[in-house]
């Protein structure tokens, strides 16, 4: 996955630690279907200006949702909800972040993990995910609304598509079946 590379720690490096989090996944009937493990960075140990700069990640405001829902009803738009799996892991890490080797992976050396990709728990994970999503939507000809930084619109001839974003949950509103199918394939 190339999430990190092992390196000798640079002098005066501040290391963050990590923790394994174990999750049970259940089906609709309450039957255990799988076990899941996630490595989480302890981002509370990060220092501003040292291993992160920006942490702000916008969310859609309720007034924008209400306005889009009113448009949807008036114009008979279709609606679909989408959840982006592993969204925070998709951001691009810009800062140098060093982390102790995870429990169970320690190779007995003094080497540390220089993170290449995001991990859950990093202070900048949400912000970087939002930057990546914004860039992707703009590449698909969506325009970000000035009045709502988590609302995007695209007009395609007679069709209109609106996407609203709440962290890693998207609501897709479209005026036609073909546009809905086209947007489903873009994720």
Tell me what each language-model feature is:
Residues 1-187:
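Long, low-complexity, charge-biased intrinsically disordered regions
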């Amino acid at each position: 996955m190339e999430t990190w590379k092992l390196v000798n720690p640079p002098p005066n490096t501040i290391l963050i630690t990590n923790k394994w989090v174990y999750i049970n996944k259940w089906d609709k009937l309450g039957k255990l279907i799988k076990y899941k493990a996630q490595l989480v960075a302890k981002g509370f140990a990060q220092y501003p200006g040292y291993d992160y700069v920006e942490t702000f990640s916008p969310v859609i405001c309720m007034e924008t949702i209400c306005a889009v829902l009113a448009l949807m009803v008036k114009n008979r738009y279709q609606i679909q909800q989408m959840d982006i799996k592993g969204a925070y892991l998709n951001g691009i890490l810009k800062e140098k972040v060093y982390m102790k080797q995870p429990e169970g992976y320690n190779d007995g050396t003094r080497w540390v993990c220089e993170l290449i990709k995001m991990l859950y728990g990093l202070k900048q994970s949400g912000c970087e995910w939002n930057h990546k999503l914004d860039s992707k939507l703009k590449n698909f000809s969506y325009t970000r609304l000035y009045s709502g930084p988590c609302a995007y619109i695209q007009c395609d001839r007679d069709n209109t598509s609106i996407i609203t974003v709440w962290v890693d949950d998207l609501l897709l509103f479209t005026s036609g079946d073909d546009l809905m199918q086209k947007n489903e394939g873009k994720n």
